[in-house]
A protein has these predicted regions:
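Boundary at the C-terminal end of the N-terminal hydrophobic targeting segment
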Residues: 10-17
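A short Gly-Trp-Pro
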Residues: 19-20, 25-146
Length: 146
């Protein structure tokens, strides 16, 4: 099934192109706090249930904590029961993907398309309409209410 998010999310402007951010490791360390740096730059994972964004129910936009790029709308969020903020889709052009081989089996990892900060992994156990679950580290996000 094809699913288009165009026009569904009022208040979200489509991105024509994304200018990459290129900062040194030292610059990232001075910009981010220790936990943000660990997750966004070192591909870490926060403890499940540790993010206040798990319980966030207001309408708004979830941005990358590293560069403020809008990644998800609250309309895409759902309670996966995993302990991490989860979304069934993402805003156009906001994410980049690669395969993560850190565990025994390969996983699809996603990053911010602008600053390449690590956000989480994609799983095929999400709700309709996509059947996908973008499992995000809450520390890697900033919530901006409408």
């Amino acid at each position: 099934m094809l699913f288009s998010i165009g026009g569904l999310f009022s208040g979200v402007k489509p991105l024509m192109s994304i200018e990459k951010i290129d900062m040194s490791d030292t610059e990232w360390q001075s910009k981010l706090n220790e936990q943000e740096y660990y997750v966004l730059r070192k591909h870490g994972t926060e403890r499940p249930g540790s993010s206040i964004l798990n319980d966030e129910k207001r309408e708004g936009i979830y941005q990358c904590a590293g560069c403020d790029l809008p990644l998800f709308s609250s309309e895409m969020k759902f309670d996966s029961g995993t302990g991490w903020p989860s979304f069934f889709d993402y805003l156009p052009k906001a994410l980049a993907f690669k395969t993560d081989f850190k565990l025994v089996f390969p996983r699809k990892e996603y990053h911010c398309a602008r600053c390449e900060g690590h956000h989480g992994h994609v799983f095929k156990d999400g709700p309709e309409p996509t059947g996908l679950r973008y499992c995000n580290n809450g520390i890697a996000l900033k919530f901006i209410p409408n």
